[in-house]
Amino acid sequence: MVRSMPLRGGRPQAPTAPTRWQLQNTVFAAESQNQPSASEAVVSSTRDAALQRRRALTTDGKAATLVQGSVGGGRVRSARDQRQPGWVRRDKGATSGVPFNLSRSSLPITNRQHPLTDTAANARLRAYEQEVKGRFDRIVPLLQRVSALQHEPDFIEQAQRLTRAELGFDLPQHILERAWVRPLDMRALFAWCVFESHRLFSDRFFQDDPLDGAAGSVAARDFEQFLLDCGIHLLDVSPCADGRLAHTVAYALRIPFSAVRRRSHAGAMFDVENTVNRWVKTEHRRHREGMPNPSTEPTRYLKVVTYHFSSLDPQHQGCAAHGSNDELAAAAGHQRLLDFREAVENSFCCGASVDLLLIGLDTDTDAIRVHPPSRDSEMVLDQWLCARELHAATASMTADQAMAQIAEAIEAGASGPMEPGMVAFLTRLIANNCSQIDYVQDLHGAPYPDAGHAERFIGVGIGFKEVHLRNLTYFAHLDTVEEGAPDLDVGVKIFKGLNVSRDLPIPVVVRFDYSGRVPGARERAIADCQRVNQAIADRYGELVNQGLLHTCLTVRDRNQTAPAEVVGSTLAPPLQEAH
């Protein structure tokens, strides 16, 4: 196959679309036929001077001098003006002695509400988080009360009444009925309560859309149109599987969950081959159906990696998959993005390529840092914008002024000229993140109290569209335990500290989504659940035999809004043998 290479200075474009270099060259050729008037020369000179001033703001720790003064009434900046803004971070050579994670800001906590904060959305998200997490948090206190009742004559009735009142479901009858002959199996009851709590919030998520982000919702349609306006036809985000990033889409970035493709992996190390296949499906749909837009339109597939770091305890509460090394987490995510782009460009002709973006998330404050990509998707690892510092710098401005300041900072922070659509996209992400920064501050009065892991269960398989809360679920997306062993092992290690150390079991929810449009898909999804369940039992046999690991098997039709269906569990009552 002959590969179509982009010309020098241009980027590969979607298979049937012209490259940006071609588009720009056409415009340049048309403009070059006409000599600029005197007024046009003044405008051009004014713009050049403005760009020089902007460059002065982002020089690596040095005062930049303009070639000449501004023609349009601007002034040449003094040395005081030429200092680098606090939200733009440069290479380590210019900041000797400063650790890599310069987002560990010493900014004081403020109670001032940012002009870009959506207080109504914050109130709605807060109510949902407290409702869901509150049920999980009531499990242990409830079971302690149930344990104290196990020798009462009406134990089963009291236990069920308490559980219904506190958690909204019944305990398994077959476990309660054994309490008179042997000690109550509190480990099994704990796992049951976790599984039932997951079932309840999953049901509500798909039936009521508490996050207002379902497909077809006003928020989802508006954001999808915004993406197209930015030149993006699909947004594909890979956060780390750490439960402290499970809320990245709906909370930290405030993106309607149905408008983004999300799949989490340990260390944000997404599978390149699988992602290429998803890119192929996306482009094929554009060709065949014109969805979300025709393939002839010059829009791009944007792949985002979200790594994380801790501003309070960087040596211990960073990414476990990268040994709490912020620099390694960012570098590994960046390299995986480059591998994905190279795989697409090497495998397909006609200038096929993708756009790339690297984002960091502070798991203590939910403030993001973005590495602004140039027009060629080039990013510099030690060059980023800190949303928390931008939040502080723009807190006293009006909303319009804050948006303009953020946009200017983004352009100034890139390693080269940026696409206007990418500037608009990043401006919106940082503006959205201002709401989340205030959300954490208002809810906790400080950074998160649970700086480390506090997940409630491990989610294994393919699916879990309903999980959008911080520290609720550790994800292990996999088709087989063998290929997903690194992700799953990290999760089990985390839960050995969270649960097993307290003599509580590790709850594992196995999920495989399927397409109800495909004959036999449901049966195959159930078989996948059973296969993975057996592989988990084999790999972690000691924990399973001690009752320290329980599984719940679920499947869901991704083409419907119906909740997941439970198809098996290690807590199911034993089958009676027929004679």
UniProtKB/Swiss-Prot annotation:
Membrane-spanning segments: none
Cofactor(s) in the UniProt record: Zn(2+)
Primary localization class, coarse: other
InterPro entries: Carboxysome_shell_carb_anhy (IPR014074), CsoSCA_C (IPR048620), CsoSCA_C_sf (IPR043066), CsoSCA_cat (IPR048539), CsoSCA_N (IPR048619), CsoSCA_N_sf (IPR043065)
Co-factor binding comment: Binds 1 Zn(2+) per monomer.
One GO BP: carbon fixation
Name of the featured protein: Carboxysome shell carbonic anhydrase
Family statement: Belongs to the beta-class carbonic anhydrase family. CsoSCA subfamily.
Known regulation of activity: Inhibited by dithiothreitol, partially inhibited by acetatzolamide and cyanide.
GO molecular function: carbonate dehydratase activity; metal ion binding
Protein's job: Reversible hydration of carbon dioxide. Essential for photosynthetic carbon dioxide fixation, supplies CO(2) to RuBisCO (ribulose bisphosphate carboxylase, cbbL-cbbS) in the carboxysome.
Protein localization: Carboxysome
Entry binding sites for Zn(2+): C240, H308, C319
Reaction(s) catalysed by this chain's protein: hydrogencarbonate + H(+) = CO2 + H2O
Subunit structure: Homodimer.
